[in-house]
Amino acid sequence: MFDENSNAAGTTPVASSLAATPNANLVSQVFNVKDSRWLQVEVCREFLRGQCARSDQECKFAHPPPNVDVQQGRVTACYDSIKGRCTRENPKCKYLHPPQHIKDQLLINGRNHLALKNLLSAQLNQTGTPMVNPMMALQQQAAAVNLIPNTPIYPPYYNGMMYPQVLQDPYTAAAVNQVLDSNQEYHSPPTDKKNQQLQTAALLGNVGGLLSAQSAAAFMANSSAAAAAAQQTPSPLLRLQRKRALEEENTNGNDMTSAAAAHTQLLSLAAGAVPMKRPTLDKNGAMLYSPVAQQAQQFNPYLLQTLQGYVPAVSCEYMQPPPF
């Protein structure tokens, strides 16, 4: 049968190890203070009003006699009566002598209370965890961070955008080379063809004896000078394209500069357009907040790229191309 005094045997090893336990004061308070909450029984409300038709042996609530003290609708059962050794007769015992069915329930409550008490003592008697050096913890954290690979981490929805390398079509490559040759021939002056024609005519003339050696040398010098001058002087079409590119670049730069200036001016006007009438003052005369309008800070998600695995917010509303 449950006995509250049996805690004395269980507390001897606990008391011997109090000096080595960091929670010695708490353990001593737990075992030295008696908790009588498990002995409390609720009083029948109908019995208090004089309307309960059941006897004290049938009602599951207590029917205390007049000599028992009732506090907040509850009474405390006599522990000696539960053990069968209460001898208080004059004056009568101020605690409840419960019937058998309430006594059985109180014994169950006592066993549960003792088990909880022993579990709490076991938890408090455990040796404390060793203190962790903060410098060692920081070093371990830095080592764990260095183990993370520096390669970027791509989400799964980026895999469809990375296509494998496709072999080039030989017919397409030949067509591209032909287009490049024709463009080069169009943009550069036709000096090579003229030189080839003149060299052919000179060879034919030398064969027929029409040109002398001096005329041939003069012809070769003139042709080389003409070729050098043609290389230094670009074609009119190429000069026109360069001029257009410079004009477009200057126009775009001026447009962007003017747009940025207008945007900044609008922001400044919007920030100072509605001044406050007067600042709110505290009881001591200090302002609660500044009456000057603060400029809004623009959020830049790319400032967080120093974090490993960070991917800026992107829109995925586009149609993904079909796989090849």
Swiss-Prot record:
It is found in: Nucleus. The gene is mbl-1. SMART domains: ZnF_C3H1. The lineage of its organism: Eukaryota, Metazoa, Ecdysozoa, Nematoda, Chromadorea. Disruption phenotype: Reduced lifespan. A zinc finger (C3H1-type) spans 38-66, 72-100. Pfam families: zf-CCCH_10. GO terms for molecular function: RNA binding; zinc ion binding. It comes from the Eukaryota. Keywords: Metal-binding, Nucleus, Repeat, RNA-binding, Zinc, Zinc-finger. PANTHER family: MUSCLEBLIND-LIKE PROTEIN, PROTEIN MUSCLEBLIND. GO terms for cellular component: cytoplasm; nucleoplasm; nucleus. Binds to RNA with repeat sequences 5'-CUG-3' and 5'-CCUG-3'. Expressed in neurons around the pharynx. This is Muscleblind-like protein. Belongs to the muscleblind family. GO terms for biological process: regulation of RNA splicing.
